[in-house]
């Protein structure tokens, strides 16, 4: 059973085994670059405890998603703002002076929102807010922080890697007052990570402010938003330093659901069979209470048999 694309809420929950990654730095102190950390609370025997673990922010993942969306939109002749084409994801705001060439300056309310999303698919999918126009467009896509799964917290680790930027003696003599040759340490992390989020397909290509209006090629925009999500999650197309710190990644599990109303999958953690039972019972209850079709759930499992053969096939819920 599949749902109509124009009435769909996509939820995902993915678990990655990631080794030696430097996807998200937060600061440098001298020649030492730190990996992002986040506090994680988990139950240890009979009590709760807190520990700090490696993490990748939802903002970092959303940036990767939006750039994947830009690439697809350009290939499919969908509108992209000139800044977004350069990888600069600055959304509309008060006293906006950076979006040159916009035709939305004199518009207000729903007309202003419609004008903006007509000009830029990124702001259509990922939202914006302009207080001067009293217009707020909530993002249609959401990503959690990527953190170690609760059952694998103790197996996550951060360690520093020593590097040298080399310069020969001739260059060092020529540039004595500059730091031509340098030593530096960069933290890398390894963990079994979980990531969750959603894509509100139904709200892509139409205004959230009343009166509700739709753009042209709404279906094409919905498809681009879905395809960008598939690329981001299955091909691990997000994060920093991918050219020299490209992590070793395995998808351990990927669950994707499609529903008429907002239904969000829990993080993939613990015993996988118990997790599947929980998802199945929850979808049954969800459909019964709201008197709607049961959410469609497709899932890929590395060590067990899922109901699809590859992570990409999980997106056949579309």
UniProtKB/Swiss-Prot annotation:
One of its GO terms (biological process) is defense response to virus. Transmembrane segments: none annotated. It comes from the Archaea. Coiled coil: none annotated. The keyword Transmembrane does not apply. Keywords: Antiviral defense. It holds the Pfam family DevR. CRISPR (clustered regularly interspaced short palindromic repeat) is an adaptive immune system that provides protection against mobile genetic elements (viruses, transposable elements and conjugative plasmids). CRISPR clusters contain spacers, sequences complementary to antecedent mobile elements, and target invading nucleic acids. CRISPR clusters are transcribed and processed into CRISPR RNA (crRNA). Part of the aCascade ribonucleoprotein complex, minimally composed of Csa2 and Cas5a, which binds crRNA. Other possible components of aCascade in strain P1 are Cas6b (SSO1437) and Csa5 (SSO1443), while SSO1399, Cas5b (SSO1400) and SSO1401 have sometimes been seen weakly associated. Csa2 is probably the major RNA-binding subunit. The Csa2-Cas5a-crRNA complex also binds target DNA homologous to crRNA, probably forming an R-loop. Purified aCascade forms a filament about 6 nm in width. The aCascade complex was purified from strain P1. Belongs to the CRISPR-associated protein Cas7/Cst2/DevR family. Subtype I-a/Apern subfamily. This is CRISPR-associated protein Cas7/Csa2 1. The gene is cas7a.
């Amino acid at each position: 059973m599949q749902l109509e694309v124009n009435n769909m809420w996509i939820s995902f929950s993915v678990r990655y085994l990631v080794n030696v990654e430097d996807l998200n730095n937060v600061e440098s102190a001298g020649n030492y670059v730190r990996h992002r950390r986040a506090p994680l609370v988990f139950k240890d025997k009979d009590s709760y405890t807190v520990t700090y673990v490696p993490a990748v922010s939802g903002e970092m993942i959303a940036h990767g998603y939006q750039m994947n969306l830009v690439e697809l939109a350009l290939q499919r002749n969908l509108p992209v703002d000139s800044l977004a084409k350069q990888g600069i994801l600055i959304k509309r705001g008060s006293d906006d002076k950076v979006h040159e060439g916009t035709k939305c300056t004199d518009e207000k309310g729903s007309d202003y929102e419609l004008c903006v999303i007509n000009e830029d698919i990124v702001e259509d999918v990922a939202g914006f807010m302009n207080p001067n126009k009293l217009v707020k467009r909530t993002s249609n896509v959401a990503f959690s922080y990527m953190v170690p799964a609760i059952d694998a917290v103790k197996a996550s680790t951060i360690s520093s890697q020593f590097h040298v930027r080399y310069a020969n003696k001739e260059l060092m003599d020529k540039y004595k007052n500059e730091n031509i040759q340098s030593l530096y340490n960069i933290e890398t992390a390894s963990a079994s990570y979980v990531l969750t989020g959603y894509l509100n397909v139904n709200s892509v290509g139409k205004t959230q402010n009343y009166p509700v209006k739709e753009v042209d090629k709404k279906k094409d925009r919905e498809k681009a938003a879905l395809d960008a999500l598939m690329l981001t999650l299955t091909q691990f197309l997000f994060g920093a330093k991918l050219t020299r710190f490209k992590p070793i990644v395995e998808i351990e599990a990927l669950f994707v659901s499609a529903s008429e109303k907002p239904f969000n999958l829990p993080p993939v953690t613990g015993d996988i069979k118990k997790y599947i039972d929980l998802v199945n019972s929850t979808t049954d209850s969800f459909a019964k209470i709201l008197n709607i079709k049961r959410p469609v759930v497709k899932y890929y499992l590395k060590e067990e048999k899922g109901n699809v053969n590859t992570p990409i096939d999980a997106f056949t819920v579309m």
